[in-house]
């Protein structure tokens, strides 16, 4: 049986990875080894991502794609290496610190909508770390203005939303903190085909119009 290197080819080195993000580097990962408990999943991992770039990680189940996102956000144990935003070392910051002070938001692959809360209440949960709650309300209004699907259901329980609308709500909730980086884990998982294009169009708009790094 062919091994993974024969099937996928030689793993790219640091210089080859830099070619994917040649300008205005925003996120840098250097020599990262990380995992859960004492188990090391990532081994000496490198990555660079430019500002307003959309970069997709592709690989088989168990390859470590989610672990990379978890490590950036602070959900794993870091054994060695460094994670930087604009040259600032953020390796040991907590998830809350990365969200509030660095501008990194994580959108889980599992359904994280609170079904019995209204769409507006779900949206405002995204601003729970804001010191001034008025700012969360202002950002929520901007989001309602941008997305008619959510605006029309703002006072309805989230459980009435379609799968695509729930994913839109999850993405929008992350936007309340006005992040510069969106970590999106399996954005199309569990969605009907008719909603998949909608979700990717939303992400493309956030990258191109609002200059988010995704």
For the regions a protein language model found, what residue spans apply to each?
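The feature captures the beta-strand-to-loop junction immediately N-terminal to the Walker
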Residues: 58-60
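Conserved ABC ATPase signature
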Residues: 157-161
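ABC-type ATPase nucleotide-binding domains, specifically the catalytic core motifs of the NBD
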Residues: 37, 55, 77, 117-138, ...
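A short, proline-enriched helix->beta-strand linker immediately N-terminal to the Walker B motif
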Residues: 176-180
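Conserved ABC transporter NBD signature motif
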Residues: 81-89, 100-101, 135-140, 145
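Helix-to-loop junction immediately C-terminal to a conserved catalytic motif
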Residues: 73
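Catalytic Walker B motif of ABC-type/P-loop ATPase nucleotide-binding domains
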Residues: 182-186
